Amino acid sequence: MDITQLILDDHHEQRRLFAILEQIDRSDTGTLSAVWARLGSFLELHAAAEEAIFYPALLQVGIAARRRSGVEEETLDAIGDHNDIRDAVAEAARHPVGSDGWYAAVAGANLANGDHMAEEEREGLTDFRRLAGLQQRHSLAVAFAAFEARNFAGVEPVDKDPGAYVSQAEAGTPSVGDGSLNIGGLK
């Protein structure tokens, strides 16, 4: 098991759920609502798991490999992307399911999420596979899977300040109330 593969698996599921939404009749608001509730919750759970497990580890291995600026930029961008996705999900909640405003907000979430996943797959996951050993990737995969399992009912969406997040992660100090398992130091 490898954390980068678990993240890719989650990305596939996110793409699949967005595609399902696109194929549901606009008037079937009950089904749209059910699929969107699952997807919105999953987007937040995935972001929280990455923020608790993956990004602190990416910063640590990047700093150890003397690639601090690269991994800091990737992490700052990712946390900002997670905030954009949260904001789009919150915007969708302000509109009746199936309305033009709801569809626009869902499209915004899909765009923000798609851009984030593409960058993460091209940069963060690639860097992590190059910099972290297989045992560390396995240990983090176990922690990532456990985080998602423990929080399957959802986590509270909270925007994070990207700069403060990076500073705390580099210092090994978890954010208060971030749902972290405090295992960012796994080697």
Region locations from a protein language model:
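Small-residue-biased structural context
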Residues: 1-187
